[in-house]
Amino acid sequence: MELSMMTFMLEFPVLFFQPGTQKEKAKEIESFIKLTAETGYKNIDLIWQTVKLVGKEEIKRMLEESGLNLSCVICMDVAGNIEGADGIVEACEYLGCKKIMLVPGSPAEDKKELFDLIVKNYSKIVNLASQKGIICVCEDDPNIKIPCGTREEVEAILNAVPGLYLVYDSANMLPSGDEVIPYYEYFADRTAHIHIKDMSVEEKKPEQYANPGADGRFYLNAPHGTGVVDFDALFEALKKHGYNDTLAIEFVPMPGMDLREDMKRVYDLFADRV
């Protein structure tokens, strides 16, 4: 097993909320890539919008200069818009990335309608990617309003799209009422990528964004080591089932902590377990 840094929580504000020119945003993205390498990681997971903004040639330069491998490209809103699928696959091939993660978004409120969109658009990109030796993966999603959370829902998608594998997320099944370890063990043979994430649970709706759970509680992404996920039990299960691929750390910054120190803290938390 190898650790990867999933910088989604750092990229997203730069891409969609912070002001700045393309060049300024690209420079900030490069600082995250450099920091990932400097804090011990050998791999990184990036959002497709980041690759588009910066340009695949510049991303390749940044990765090569930092000595990082691009382990996965994360594509958002795939159920609603699959335009540019050829470009996604082409960029991944150019960057030496062997995995594409598909995130559905929620372009339809009806679960059945959204399921049909997911199957249609996922199938298209899976077929394109497989021709280039690239694996497509989808994850268990914490949004219980879309058909991607429960074990049964995820299994239905995997069964409907041949060649699609699971990104097992170590916390996303909690809002739907599933359990961390049994969920992984059920899908162990169909898991090709893993997100290591922690999650906290609140009885009342918090000020920050949280996913409502089927039990009426609220589920928030949490800094690693501060939430409810039992990582000792999880790593025992991973080794038991022979998982030997990438573990992407879904980084959530610790409030008030220096970013470099925090990224290194999380690396040290898991480095001895792989």
What are the language-model segments listed below?
Residues 1-99, 130, 163-165, 267-274:
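N-terminal pre-domain/capping segments
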Residues 45, 72, 101, 137, ...:
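Conserved beta-strand positions in the central sheet of alpha/beta enzyme cores
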Residues 54-60, 83-89, 115-116, 144-162, ...:
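Distinct, well-ordered alpha-helical segments
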Residues 92-113, 132-144, 248-249:
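Active-site groove signature of glycoside hydrolases
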Residues 127-228:
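Acidic/histidine-rich catalytic cores of soluble enzymes
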Residues 245-270:
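C-terminal/domain-terminus segments
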